[in-house]
């Protein structure tokens, strides 16, 4: 059995575990008053639709886990825990750094409260089942030899790419505001239109630069695992990161709103999906253009 098949099976099981744990801690969060009132109504009654969705993402993350397994620190099931904590960093923590400036503090606390339990459990489950299946079906396979580069080599290209990503996000936000596609997010307060535009550019540039610097460092680590050459490597990497971060999060929200017939919110979310995808493509183009493999 190939390692990616083992990863997909382990991910399927871990995705089911993710659903159960998410449901438990989501309900606990609701019971203690987390999440804004307008959002709570969409948070309940989604178990049936969440099961196939979380299993799908579990399979996707399981396949990726099988590809990067030998690059992850630790041994055995601890690799799975590290992998889960990595996703806790780049998904809920990253997402909430974008939401808090808009005043969605209670939602951010609720999401982090659930995620701090869900992602480590997902990672451990993935690590356990991957190891069990790997030991049974690929017991003689040794550690893969993957050529990696110093993560510091990706810091500056990542930071510059993040600045450009932030500028792109700021332009899109201003265009959306001018055309009436979306207004000021819940919790946001502005004094003037110009102030709103400046805040959009400033916030997006700063936050995207910080996270893109981190993504740039990991790009150097997984460079030889990413499809494509030169600039296209950057684009492929960016689209993968979009898929497993913003793309994954948007799919959860989209399903929750669709399950409650909130179709206006669904339409806005679909627009956001393409907007964030565009921003990531800009990041990938610049990263691929600027990154240079360190000299041996």
Name every feature range the model reports, one short phrase each.
Residues 1-296:
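Juxtamembrane/disordered regions of integral membrane proteins
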